[in-house]
């Protein structure tokens, strides 16, 4: 066991010992019991601000609702901090029917593809956002999320050499951004 901090609260097991413990856990508990442990770990990590670990445990528990909520909250900041592969792994693990309903997850997919220069791959997500924002909602989408969507669309049009079209996306966008 190796200490990870000066206070003696965090320790790391040798990787072989950790593997032994994981094997014993899997051999002594049912799959459902292991899933419950992963759910508890996910919630603990979330409460302690360790979102990467929380998402990984939520996915290991097959708790896609918790994983999707956590990804919605953290995907964009992580993409902007160059953690694209981690976010991509998470996004691919979330069922497609959940992706289709989540503006934030679609936004993450769009940004991830745009930042990689994969414009055609971003288009389905940008188009889905247009559809999601057009639907009547009991809770309207936040103005900032819609403004971000407009920014993505403008970036896409600019990259296609259409600056005039990017300025004309939404006449109310400029007013909304100022309010």
Where are these regions (language model features)?
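Short, glycine- and charge-enriched coil/turn segments that flank and shape catalytic ligand pockets
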Residues: 6, 28-32, 134-140
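Active-site micro-motifs of SAM-dependent methyltransferase domains
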Residues: 19, 76, 131
């Amino acid at each position: 066991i190796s200490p990870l901090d000066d206070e003696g609260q965090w320790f790391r097991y040798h990787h072989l010992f950790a593997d032994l413990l994981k094997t014993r856990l899997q051999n002594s508990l049912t799959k459902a019991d292991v899933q419950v442990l992963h759910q508890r770990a996910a919630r603990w990590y979330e409460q302690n601000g360790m979102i990467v670990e929380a998402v990984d445990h939520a996915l290991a528990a097959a708790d896609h609702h918790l994983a999707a909520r956590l990804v919605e909250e953290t995907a964009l900041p992580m993409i902007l901090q160059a953690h694209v592969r981690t976010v991509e792994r998470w996004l691919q693990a979330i069922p497609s029917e959940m992706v289709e309903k989540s503006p934030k997850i679609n936004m993450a997919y769009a940004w991830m593809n745009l930042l990689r220069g994969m414009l055609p791959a971003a288009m389905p997500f940008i188009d889905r956002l247009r559809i999601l924002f057009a639907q009547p909602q009991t809770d309207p989408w936040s103005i900032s999320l819609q403004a971000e969507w407009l920014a993505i669309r403008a970036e896409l049009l600019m990259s296609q050499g259409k600056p005039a079209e990017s300025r004309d996306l939404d006449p109310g966008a400029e007013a909304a951004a100022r309010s």
